[in-house]
């Protein structure tokens, strides 16, 4: 995503908040598959979003990340940390961490949500538990429905309760 593309999108319909749900693609759906995206896909795209936000006076971005990024790394179960460090998933975690560092330093308001293991469900009534940025206490097999994540992203965009934080969420 080039800065010129983001500018065109902003010119067409100026947002008040930007929600970013990028994920770096892999060669297959397997989490162990080789990455096919540039190493900084998410960081560079978010940098372009932040640059356009500053140009157009947009103050807030809400970014989908993953449990284990940033401060939550130390509270990710040790088996999962080993998996994330030694598999091809490490590239995405590196990219997420670069995104976090750069967005935090940019001066824009942000919410970086870190759901635990994503699952499919049609149940729109599942409660969402919000954990602190460090994710201390999140159970090993905790999961978050994609539907819950989508709902939470919109709620975070519309409110201010989670501004300038990076909470972990689960169902």
Regions found by a protein language model. Give the residues of each.
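NAD(P)H-binding glycine-rich loop region in Rossmannoid oxidoreductase-like domains
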Residues: 1-48, 52-55
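Oxidoreductase cofactor-interface core, primarily capturing Rossmann-like NAD(P)-dependent enzymes
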Residues: 25, 38-39, 55-56, 60, ...
């Amino acid at each position: 995503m080039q800065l010129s593309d983001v500018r065109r999108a902003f010119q067409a319909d100026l947002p008040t908040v930007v929600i970013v749900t990028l994920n770096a693609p892999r060669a297959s759906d397997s989490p162990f598959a080789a990455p096919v995206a540039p190493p900084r896909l998410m960081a560079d795209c978010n940098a372009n979003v932040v640059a356009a936000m500053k140009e157009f006076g947009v103050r807030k971005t809400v970014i989908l990340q993953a449990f284990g990024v940033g401060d939550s790394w130390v509270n990710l179960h040790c088996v999962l940390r080993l998996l994330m460090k030694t598999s091809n998933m490490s590239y995405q975690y590196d990219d997420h961490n670069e995104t976090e560092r750069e967005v935090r330093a940019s001066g824009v308001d942000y919410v970086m949500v870190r759901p635990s293991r994503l699952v499919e469900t049609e149940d729109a009534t599942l409660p969402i538990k919000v954990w602190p940025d460090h994710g201390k206490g999140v159970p090993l097999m905790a999961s978050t429905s994609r539907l819950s994540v989508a709902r939470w992203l919109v709620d975070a965009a519309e409110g201010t309760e989670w501004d300038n934080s990076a909470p972990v969420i689960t169902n």
